[in-house]
């Protein structure tokens, strides 16, 4: 039995959500999607039993955004195992390391089951790792560490598998889009909402954490509002300010514009001679993948540095030094997370920007090659679909050369652009981080298109017959 067959067999034995017998209406899909989000948000607000704090993972902010996780809660792992399994399977399929034809319905089913099986394995492994670390560092219960770890691990396994089922519920047609996208969007919007409107008072100045409540409180009490324009406080490092708010709005507008830009390649169809159309290549060809990989790499090095402190302090110091270049301001530093940090540490800001953008370019080019987005794969798909480029022989090698003129420059420049968006968001203190903004905008645009599509099908039933639904 092959590797993918073994994973698919495991996936088949796991509890699953069945497909609806009849296609739900748009209203029903919206209700199920809302229910899934509410359950996720409840889990993200429910503390793990046996854990008093989760300060050990407090600095893994970017991972929490990417994986829609919340430290110290039932959503500690979030969608991390699902995304990790999905990326690995996509890389294996795109690089032809596994023999599978995603155009074959049976192989697609096998691929989906294998991905689910791999996600479950990651759930077990990550639950064991995080559960043990949390039990060792974040509890005051008078019991053995192994006993507490067992309780925490059990909670993480059940809760994370429930998140997997919620994702499956939406993907199988009960809801809209995918649960993974929906939970990321909900997580980023939650962070942005609290940065703008949070009323909890956590600062040394006794101001609410949200910008607008803090501004109202400061004006009403005739307090100094300069720190709310640009946060220069070394006591309240994470207080959102006006510069961050303006940056957030500007980056959202820029990201929407860039996300909707396309490069059109004229083509014709062998079946429909004389009819010309175009194939759009997204200007942000690699989407937010490069910055996600950079953020995950930095967070993982930081996590391993923390874990290594129990085994080898010297190794931990080395890893902490390496991970420091992935974050600005550096973790555990007394520098406010605002544009003022650039004034205090300009060399650190420059080092962070250079490292982040260079790695974004490397990951962007690598992703194109391993995920099947390269010119050779795209050319082969065009030939198999009977699509031709006018004035060019229908030869995969020739078409590959033409596509290479577009794809690699797009991959290079889009990697730089998403890297710059992430860097400027960090340096200027944008709400939700640059990666969060990129993910939220991309997902929101996808849902807008999906809602328009579903609405069109309901308004014009004839379209269902034309597209075979």
From Swiss-Prot:
It is found in: Cell membrane. Keywords: Cell membrane, Membrane, Protein transport, Translocation, Transmembrane, Transmembrane helix, Transport. It comes from the Archaea. GO terms for biological process: SRP-dependent cotranslational protein targeting to membrane, translocation. Residues 60-67, 68-79, 80-88 dip into the membrane without crossing it. Residues 48-59, 132-146, 198-240, 310-347, 430-432 are extracellular. GO terms for molecular function: protein transmembrane transporter activity; signal sequence binding. Residues 1-20, 89-109, 172-178, 263-287, 368-410, 448-469 are cytoplasmic. It is a multi-pass membrane protein. Its main location: membrane. InterPro entries: SecY, SecY/SEC61-alpha, SecY_CS, SecY_dom_sf, Translocon_Sec61/SecY_plug_dom. GO terms for cellular component: plasma membrane. The chain crosses the membrane at residues 21-47, 60-88, 110-131, 147-171, 179-197, 241-262, 288-309, 348-367, 411-429, 433-447. Gene3D superfamilies: SecY subunit domain. Belongs to the SecY/SEC61-alpha family. Component of the Sec protein translocase complex. Heterotrimer consisting of alpha (SecY), beta (SecG) and gamma (SecE) subunits. The heterotrimers can form oligomers, although 1 heterotrimer is thought to be able to translocate proteins. Interacts with the ribosome. May interact with SecDF, and other proteins may be involved. The central subunit of the protein translocation channel SecYEG. Consists of two halves formed by TMs 1-5 and 6-10. These two domains form a lateral gate at the front which open onto the bilayer between TMs 2 and 7, and are clamped together by SecE at the back. The channel is closed by both a pore ring composed of hydrophobic SecY resides and a short helix (helix 2A) on the extracellular side of the membrane which forms a plug. The plug probably moves laterally to allow the channel to open. The ring and the pore may move independently. This is Protein translocase subunit SecY. It comes from Saccharolobus solfataricus (strain ATCC 35092 / DSM 1617 / JCM 11322 / P2) (Sulfolobus solfataricus). The lineage of its organism: Archaea, Thermoproteota, Thermoprotei, Sulfolobales, Sulfolobaceae. The gene is secY.
């Amino acid at each position: 039995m092959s590797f993918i067959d073994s994973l698919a067999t495991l996936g088949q034995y796991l509890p699953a959500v069945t497909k609806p017998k009849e296609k739900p209406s748009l209203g029903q899909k919206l209700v199920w999607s809302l229910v899934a989000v509410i359950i996720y948000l409840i889990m993200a607000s429910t503390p793990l039993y046996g854990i008093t704090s989760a300060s050990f993972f407090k600095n893994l902010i970017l991972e929490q955004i990417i994986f829609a996780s919340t430290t110290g809660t039932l959503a500690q792992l979030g969608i991390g195992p699902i995304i990790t399994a999905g990326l690995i399977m996509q890389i294996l399929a795109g690089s032809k390391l596994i023999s599978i034809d995603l155009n074959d319905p049976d192989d697609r089913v096998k691929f989906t089951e294998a991905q689910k099986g791999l996600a479950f394995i990651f759930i077990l492994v990550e639950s064991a790792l995080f559960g043990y670390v949390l039990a060792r560092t974040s509890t005051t219960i008078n019991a053995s560490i192994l006993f507490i770890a067992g309780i925490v691990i059990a909670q993480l396994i059940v809760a994370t598998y429930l998140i997997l089922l919620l994702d499956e519920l939406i993907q199988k047609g009960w809801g809209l889009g995918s649960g993974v996208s929906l939970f990321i969007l909900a997580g980023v919007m939650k962070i942005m909402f609290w940065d703008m409107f949070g009323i909890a008072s956590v600062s040394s100045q006794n101001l609410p954490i949200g910008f607008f409540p803090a501004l109202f409180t400061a004006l009403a009490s005739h307090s100094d509002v300069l720190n709310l324009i640009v946060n220069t406080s070394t006591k309240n490092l994470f207080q959102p300010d006006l510069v961050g708010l303006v940056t957030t709005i500007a980056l959202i507008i820029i990201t929407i514009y860039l996300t909707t830009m396309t490069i059109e390649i004229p083509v014709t169809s062998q079946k429909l001679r004389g009819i010309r159309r175009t194939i759009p290549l997204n200007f942000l060809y690699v989407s937010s993948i490069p910055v996600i990989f950079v953020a995950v790499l930095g967070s993982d090095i930081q996590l391993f540095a923390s874990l290594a402190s129990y085994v080898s302090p010297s190794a931990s110091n080395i890893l902490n030094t390496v991970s420091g270049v992935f974050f600005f301001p550096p973790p555990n530093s007394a520098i406010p997370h605002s544009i003022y940090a650039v004034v205090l540490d300009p060399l650190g800001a420059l080092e962070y920007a250079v490292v982040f953008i260079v790695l974004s370019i490397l990951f962007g080019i690598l992703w194109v090659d391993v995920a099947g987005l390269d010119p050779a794969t795209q050319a082969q798909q065009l030939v198999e679909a009977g699509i031709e480029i006018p004035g060019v022989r229908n030869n995969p090698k020739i078409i590959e050369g033409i596509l290479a003129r577009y794809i690699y420059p797009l991959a290079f420049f889009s990697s730089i652009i998403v890297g710059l968006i992430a860097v400027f968001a960090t340096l200027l203190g944008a709400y939700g981080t640059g990666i969060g903004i990129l993910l939220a905008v991309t997902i929101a645009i996808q849902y807008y298109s999906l809602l328009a599509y579903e609405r069109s099908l309901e308004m014009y039933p004839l379209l269902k017959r034309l597209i075979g639904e």
